[in-house]
Amino acid sequence: MSRGDETLPYDSDQGCYVSLSPVNTDRIRAVLHGHDLNFGQSSEEELAVPTRNAVYFWNTSNPHILQLRAHWRGIATDDAQFASLVEEVRRCNSTRTGPKAYLAPFEDGRRYGLIAECDIVATNGLSEAQLDAFFETSMSMIMGFFSDLEETLSDFVTWNEEGDHE
């Protein structure tokens, strides 16, 4: 006995199959509005959400993957700070289930930033519940990681609670 289209995910809480929709900037825009977040268009396929300690980029350019990538505001300007960032990236990637962390060299080749990223496979689209859950979990994981960074690497923090440089 069939309960419906078995190719769609079944939501046991609602007792029905839920539809999947392609992920695009319009859907991300609706999620961000729903959470009262300020954001701008970074490109046709990417929205940027500035916060006090990072800029979060919601990227829909790959039709198979939805990516949330956040650039932390802390910057390594010397060898000791670079080594500290390397250690924090290593620690994040070896002890946390997410986000994935990596270093990002600046164009001058002498300074480095840190990026944290969460991805979800979206080849068949995502339901509203899946998109909301990805928003909640990925934002929480990245924000928690950045909060820990600010505690561990307090000398990197050059901004105040409002996000202005001190």
Predicted regions and their residues:
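Charge-rich, low-complexity N-terminal segments
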Residues: 1-62
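A short, surface-exposed beta-strand/turn
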Residues: 62-64, 138-141
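A short acidic/glycine-rich loop-to-helix N-cap element
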Residues: 122-137
